[in-house]
Structures are given as C-alpha cells and as structure tokens.
Amino acid sequence: MKVAASVRKICEKCRLIRRRGRLLVICSNPKHKQRQG
C-alpha cells in the first residue's frame, strides 16, 4: 500500500473509492494499491 499526497489511477483496472473519508485506489495488481495520506 503506497501512501501518497495525490492518488491516481495507474492502469485501466484501477478503481478510485472513498472509504472512511480517505481516497483509495484498488486494483487487481497489488502494486497499484494506494491511499491518500
């Protein structure tokens, strides 16, 4: 899980979702997981 100031989609399978007021990127590729910190 990468913690980044600005999260963005890396590939077309990446999905931006909002969970508990945080912006997350979930993807089939585990390397693409990101959270806004």
UniProtKB/Swiss-Prot annotation:
GO terms for biological process: translation. Keywords: Chloroplast, Plastid, Ribonucleoprotein, Ribosomal protein. It is found in: Plastid, Chloroplast. GO terms for cellular component: chloroplast; ribonucleoprotein complex; ribosome. PROSITE patterns: RIBOSOMAL_L36 (PS00828). The keyword Ribonucleoprotein applies. It comes from the Eukaryota. It holds the Pfam family Ribosomal_L36. Its main location: plastid. One of its GO terms (molecular function) is structural constituent of ribosome. Belongs to the bacterial ribosomal protein bL36 family. This is Large ribosomal subunit protein bL36c. It comes from Pisum sativum (Garden pea). The gene is rpl36.
